[in-house]
């Protein structure tokens, strides 16, 4: 699915990807470590793999931290825009068209299926 987003004057989007909440090797262990990303933006575009939502030993932890992070976004008045990655394939949108298609965003596995055939 393609999601579209048009920012109004004064709105700002920030882009991140591959946070991997719940994974043992994630650089950010707790959602609160990423609170600084919510400053100065109205939308946070996550280009895949916010957390480990596929069935795995770290799924429960990933889902819990994902929920906490999304609540942090809402509390800060930031609208999260979630795109599917190969570790969170259940997200609805796989591609974001921003500003009428002048900017597009997606997770890398969407272009190169061979790097993540399970995604």
What are these regions (language model features)?
Residues 19, 105-109:
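Histidine-centered catalytic micro-motifs
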Residues 108-119:
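Active-site-proximal loop/helix segment associated with metal-binding centers of metalloenzymes
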